């Protein structure tokens, strides 16, 4: 019967008694997946790279010498060299950079000094921005750069991360209300090849050393390789501790959020930066629960910490501790402060929240005396906020308060803001201050700090222009910002919202949340933006709840992982979005409100069973009969669709077996043929009664399958033994005794004739026919034994006594005939036909016993005085015939005994005759005749009985 499985797809086997059955074994090793990963240290969602270009010009009515050019160079100092033991993947991936980068370029006629800033803000306008400050005379050219991009390709060979999936399914819990608190695992996150390098760098022509020019497009790059122990789990933490003169970010301050990504944008760890301790604490996501052997490398933009590293041309120890691994390097820092310049400004920092520019301007560092000083700030693309009261004017009382890093300690300055009137105009884009304030002359020095907020209405990239109009000349300084790579823009104060809801077990599989249905703990949930970039990930809590916080208006994607042992329920059932399932991937829109309707339901995946029966097919018909029993101890192996062994069992005492907890899918069942047994015929009848063969393919589709049977019968050896024993023994004994006694006084004639004839005929014929036909292992032994025993006994006794005085004639005739016939026929025919290993024993024993006894007794007594004639004739005939179809043996002894005594044969005269003796002689004669006749009758009678 072919293709007879209705619920299952199966392949039978062609029966062959010589088939060898084997179990295919599939080595499973843990599949390894190599994922090239470059870690990204990000600040926040949308981050930008800004370049600030500041140009200062001086219009002079008199000939004035310009400040000499200062060529500043920086040379990196390597304090230690670490061996690179990081494995690289097969494909290059971009190295990780800080998510924000800003470059500020300040330009004057004589010198450059860089200043770098890193910004992180998803809601404020700014990407890469270039500022240009201009005046009639250029004094300096300063660039302030920090890395604001989310991910930037670096020209160096990228390090990678190689990852393979974990085999275990560990479900860590990250509750919404109280995130899981893990263990510090600094000792389980290992860093190597740590380096702090200057990106670009400037060589000091005098010393030949490479210097870090903080306001001339230079940034620092922190690089390292790392490995993570497999024992690390979601919620565990590790730290980056930055030293006294070193911090993450650039001109733009580091964001509080510092996430760690792989090359595909998946979040490995979420970092929180604490500016007070200058430490970032990273918390691992469920990524480490899903993968093992995580290793890789990273590159992070960093900057000099301006409040501590304050002096130009000074070497500072840049130190960092990653986990438990510490590294430091001496780096020369230069901010490009020009002390002889009446007006100079710099971007102190860019706020990482609203991307506002926090500016510092130094006025009259040379301490010149002026009769006129009007300080004017013009903003393009930015605005002042008069209500913020962050326009500050400080009077300098000590020349040392003009620190090179443009981050003076304002607590040591004299705040004179209230002494001046700040006049805002041009829609708060212009601020004017008269620094003379009624004085006729003044040589006072000032430090002025301002905050400029991005203006969303502006279509250009923005700039900040400064002028100091004096009685001697008009000084100018300009900071302009241009986008290098795009970023979304929004107000810094935009409200944040939440997104999330619930993952539940849909026990009745109706696709709706019912009151009695509970949440599922430990489900992985990933949040992505509209471009598919991963923003965050979390794990459902013990109640099945999850939540993402701090989100702006927009469209998001939420992905749910399927928990082990579950199947996604039907999505989008009904019209109530609050109680349905949104499937494995859904889209959520935030528009001025939280969105807590993104749910997903799962039900426990049903498990099925497979198996049935292995039986002894005694009649070899390939069908299970009610009298046939199961076979115990048959090994049965189950393989999945890939050929991997997923289960092995043995049949029980009733021949039954089964495999449980199976998903719907394709499987192969392999029966191992028991020793000494032969596979029976397959697919001979109904599916639940036939044999399916040694290997059976089966498909389970939402049901159990208990029709997978197999039958065997015993292997036979044909041994045909035919034993025929035929023994024929014929014994014929004929004994004839004839005694004739005659006594005659005269004229006695005695004639004794004895005839004994014994005839024995024995015929033994043995015919044994054994026919054995055996296909395999046939042994035929035929032994024929035929025994026939024939016994013939003939006894004849004849006694004749004659006494005659004269003329006595005695005649005695004895005839003894013995006939014995024994016929024994033995025919043994054994026919054995065996396909294989058949043993047939045929034994035939034929015994024939024939006994023939013939006894003849003849007694004749004659007494005659005269004229007596005695004649005794004894005839003994014994005939024995034995016929046996086997082996015949005959033995016929014949012993005729006839004795005639003639007492008168020597007489010389005839018996006397006379009247006196006639009666006597006649009586004697007749007596003798009667005796002889009686003897003959008796003998003949016995002869008939024997026959």
Swiss-Prot record:
<feature type="compositionally biased region" description="Basic and acidic residues">
    <location>
        <begin position="72"/>
        <end position="83"/>
    </location>
</feature>
<dbReference type="Pfam" id="PF04650">
    <property type="entry name" value="YSIRK_signal"/>
</dbReference>
<comment type="subunit">
    <text>Homodimerizes; via N2-Domain. Interacts with host NRXN1; this interaction mediates bacterial attachment to host cells.</text>
</comment>
<dbReference type="Pfam" id="PF17961">
    <property type="entry name" value="Big_8"/>
</dbReference>
<feature type="compositionally biased region" description="Polar residues">
    <location>
        <begin position="56"/>
        <end position="71"/>
    </location>
</feature>
<feature type="short sequence motif" description="LPXTG sorting signal">
    <location>
        <begin position="910"/>
        <end position="914"/>
    </location>
</feature>
<dbReference type="GO" id="GO:0007155">
    <property type="term" value="P:cell adhesion"/>
</dbReference>
<feature type="region of interest" description="Ligand binding A region">
    <location>
        <begin position="51"/>
        <end position="495"/>
    </location>
</feature>
<comment type="function">
    <text>Cell surface-associated calcium-binding protein which plays an important role in adhesion and pathogenesis. Mediates interactions with components of the extracellular matrix such as host NRXN1 to promote bacterial adhesion.</text>
</comment>
<dbReference type="GO" id="GO:0005576">
    <property type="term" value="C:extracellular region"/>
</dbReference>
<keyword id="KW-0732">Signal</keyword>
<keyword id="KW-0572">Peptidoglycan-anchor</keyword>
<protein>
    <recommendedName>
        <fullName>Serine-aspartate repeat-containing protein C</fullName>
    </recommendedName>
</protein>
<comment type="similarity">
    <text>Belongs to the serine-aspartate repeat-containing protein (SDr) family.</text>
</comment>
<feature type="compositionally biased region" description="Low complexity">
    <location>
        <begin position="912"/>
        <end position="927"/>
    </location>
</feature>
<keyword id="KW-0677">Repeat</keyword>
<feature type="region of interest" description="Disordered">
    <location>
        <begin position="51"/>
        <end position="164"/>
    </location>
</feature>
<feature type="region of interest" description="Disordered">
    <location>
        <begin position="678"/>
        <end position="927"/>
    </location>
</feature>
<feature type="compositionally biased region" description="Polar residues">
    <location>
        <begin position="84"/>
        <end position="155"/>
    </location>
</feature>
<feature type="propeptide" description="Removed by sortase">
    <location>
        <begin position="914"/>
        <end position="947"/>
    </location>
</feature>
<feature type="signal peptide">
    <location>
        <begin position="1"/>
        <end position="50"/>
    </location>
</feature>
<dbReference type="InterPro" id="IPR050972">
    <property type="entry name" value="SDr-like"/>
</dbReference>
<dbReference type="Pfam" id="PF17210">
    <property type="entry name" value="SdrD_B"/>
</dbReference>
<dbReference type="InterPro" id="IPR013783">
    <property type="entry name" value="Ig-like_fold"/>
</dbReference>
<dbReference type="Pfam" id="PF10425">
    <property type="entry name" value="SdrG_C_C"/>
</dbReference>
<feature type="domain" description="CNA-B 2">
    <location>
        <begin position="607"/>
        <end position="717"/>
    </location>
</feature>
<feature type="domain" description="CNA-B 1">
    <location>
        <begin position="496"/>
        <end position="606"/>
    </location>
</feature>
<feature type="short sequence motif" description="YSIRK-G/S signaling motif">
    <location>
        <begin position="21"/>
        <end position="32"/>
    </location>
</feature>
<dbReference type="InterPro" id="IPR011266">
    <property type="entry name" value="Adhesin_Fg-bd_dom_2"/>
</dbReference>
<dbReference type="InterPro" id="IPR008966">
    <property type="entry name" value="Adhesion_dom_sf"/>
</dbReference>
<keyword id="KW-0106">Calcium</keyword>
<dbReference type="Pfam" id="PF00746">
    <property type="entry name" value="Gram_pos_anchor"/>
</dbReference>
<keyword id="KW-0134">Cell wall</keyword>
<feature type="compositionally biased region" description="Acidic residues">
    <location>
        <begin position="685"/>
        <end position="695"/>
    </location>
</feature>
<dbReference type="InterPro" id="IPR033764">
    <property type="entry name" value="Sdr_B"/>
</dbReference>
<feature type="modified residue" description="Pentaglycyl murein peptidoglycan amidated threonine">
    <location>
        <position position="913"/>
    </location>
</feature>
<dbReference type="InterPro" id="IPR019931">
    <property type="entry name" value="LPXTG_anchor"/>
</dbReference>
<keyword id="KW-0964">Secreted</keyword>
<dbReference type="InterPro" id="IPR011252">
    <property type="entry name" value="Fibrogen-bd_dom1"/>
</dbReference>
<dbReference type="InterPro" id="IPR005877">
    <property type="entry name" value="YSIRK_signal_dom"/>
</dbReference>
<dbReference type="InterPro" id="IPR041171">
    <property type="entry name" value="SDR_Ig"/>
</dbReference>
<feature type="compositionally biased region" description="Acidic residues">
    <location>
        <begin position="712"/>
        <end position="886"/>
    </location>
</feature>
């Amino acid at each position: 019967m072919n293709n007879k499985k209705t619920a299952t797809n199966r392949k039978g086997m062609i029966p062959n008694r010589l088939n060898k059955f084997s179990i295919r074994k599939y080595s499973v090793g843990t599949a390894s997946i190599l994922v090239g990963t470059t870690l990204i240290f990000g600040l926040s969602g949308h981050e930008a790279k800004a370049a600030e270009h500041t140009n200062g010009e001086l219009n002079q009515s008199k000939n004035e010498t310009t400040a000499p050019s200062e060529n500043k160079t920086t040379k990196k100092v390597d304090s230690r060299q670490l061996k690179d033991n990081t494995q690289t993947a097969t494909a290059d991936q971009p190295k990780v950079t800080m998510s924000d980068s800003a470059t500020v370029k300040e330009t004057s006629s004589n010198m450059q000094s860089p200043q770098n800033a890193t910004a992180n803000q998803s809601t404020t306008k700014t990407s890469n921005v270039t500022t240009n400050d201009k005046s009639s005379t250029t004094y300096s050219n300063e660039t302030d750069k920090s890395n604001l991009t989310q991910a930037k390709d670096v020209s160096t060979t990228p390090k990678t991360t190689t990852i393979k999936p974990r085999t275990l399914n560990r479900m860590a819990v990250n509750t919404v209300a109280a995130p899981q608190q893990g263990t510090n695992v600094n000792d389980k996150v290992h860093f190597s090849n740590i380096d702090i390098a200057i990106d670009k760098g400037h060589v000091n022509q005098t010393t030949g050393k490479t210097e870090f020019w903080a306001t001339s497009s230079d940034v620092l790059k922190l690089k390292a390789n790392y490995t993570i122990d497999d024992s690390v789990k979601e919620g565990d933490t590790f730290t980056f501790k930055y030293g006294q003169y070193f911090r993450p970010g650039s001109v733009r301050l580091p964001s509080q959020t510092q996430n760690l990504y792989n090359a595909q944008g998946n979040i490995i760890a979420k970092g929180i930066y604490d500016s007070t301790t200058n430490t970032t604490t990273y918390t691992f996501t469920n990524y480490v629960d899903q993968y093992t052997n995580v290793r890789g490398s990273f590159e992070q933009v960093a900057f000099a910490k301006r409040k501590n590293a304050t002096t130009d041309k000074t070497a500072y120890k840049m130190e960092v501790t990653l986990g438990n691994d510490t590294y430091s390097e001496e780096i020369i820092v230069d901010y490009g402060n020009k002390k002889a310049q009446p007006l100079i400004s710099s971007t102190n920092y860019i706020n990482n929240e609203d991307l506002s520019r926090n500016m510092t301007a130094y006025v009259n560092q040379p301490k010149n005396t002026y009769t006129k000083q009007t300080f004017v700030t013009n903003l393009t693309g930015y605005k002042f906020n008069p209500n913020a009261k962050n326009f500050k004017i400080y009077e300098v009382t000590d020349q040392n308060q003009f620190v090179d890093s443009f981050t003076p300690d304002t607590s040591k300055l004299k705040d004179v803001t209230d002494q001046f009137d700040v006049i805002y105009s041009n829609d708060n884009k212009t601020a004017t201050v008269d620094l003379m304030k009624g004085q006729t002359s003044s040589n006072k020095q000032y430090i002025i700090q301002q905050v400029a907020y991005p203006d969303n209405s502006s279509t250009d990239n923005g700039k900040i222009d400064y002028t100091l109009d004096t009685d001697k000349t008009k000084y100018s300084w300009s900071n302009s910002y241009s986008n290098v790579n795009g970023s979304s823009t929004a107000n810094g104060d935009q409200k944040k919202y939440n997104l999330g809801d619930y993952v539940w077990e849909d026990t009745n599989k109706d696709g709706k949340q019912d009151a009695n249905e509970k949440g599922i703990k430990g489900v992985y949930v990933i949040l992505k933006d509209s471009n598919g970039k991963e923003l965050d990930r979390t794990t459902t809590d013990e109640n099945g709840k999850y939540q993402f916080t701090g989100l702006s208006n927009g469209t998001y994607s939420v992905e749910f992982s399927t928990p082990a042992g579950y199947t996604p329920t039907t999505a989008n059932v009904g019209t109530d979005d609050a109680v349905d399932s949104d499937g494995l991937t859904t889209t959520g829109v935030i528009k001025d409100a939280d969105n807590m309707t993104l749910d997903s339901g799962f039900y426990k995946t049903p498990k099925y069973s497979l198996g049935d029966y292995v039986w002894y097919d005694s009649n070899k018909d390939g069908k299970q009969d009610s009298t046939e029993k199961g076979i115990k101890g048959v090994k049965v192996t189950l393989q999945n669709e890939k050929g991997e062994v997923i289960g092995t069992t043995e049949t029980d005492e009733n021949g039954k077996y089964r495999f449980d907890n199976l998903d719907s899918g394709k499987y192969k069942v392999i029966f191992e043929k028991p020793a000494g047994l032969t596979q029976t015929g397959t697919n001979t009848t109904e599916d639940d009664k036939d044999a399916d063969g040694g290997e059976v393919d089966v498909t389970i589709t939402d049901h159990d399958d208990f029709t997978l049977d197999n039958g065997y019968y015993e292997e036979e050896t044909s041994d045909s033994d035919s034993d025929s024993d035929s023994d024929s023994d014929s014994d014929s004994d004929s004994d004839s005794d004839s005694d004739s006694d005659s006594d005659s006084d005269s004229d006695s004639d005695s004639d004794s004739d004895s005839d004994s004839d014994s005839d024995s005929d024995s015929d033994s014929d043995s015919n044994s026919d054994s026919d054995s036909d055996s296909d395999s292992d046939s042994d035929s032994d035929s032994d024929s034994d035929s025994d026939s025993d024939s016994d013939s006994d003939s006894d004849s006794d004849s006694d004749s006594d004659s006494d005659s005085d004269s003329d006595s004639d005695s005649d005695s005739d004895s005839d003894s005939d013995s006939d014995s016939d024994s016929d024994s026929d033995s025919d043994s025919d054994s026919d054995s036909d065996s396909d294989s290993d058949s043993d047939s024993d045929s034994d035939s024993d034929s015994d024939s016993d024939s006994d023939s006894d013939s006894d003849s007794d003849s007694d004749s007594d004659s007494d005659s005085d005269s004229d007596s004639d005695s004649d005794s004739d004894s005839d003994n005939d014994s005939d024995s015939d034995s016929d046996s179809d086997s082996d015949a043996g005959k033995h016929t002894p014949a012993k005729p005994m006839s004795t005639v005594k003639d007492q008168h044969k020597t007489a010389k005269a005839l018996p006397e005759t006379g009247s006196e003796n006639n009666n006597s002689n006649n009586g004697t004669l007749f007596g003798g005749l009667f005796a002889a006749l009686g003897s003959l009758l008796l003998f003949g009678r016995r002869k008939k009985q024997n026959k």
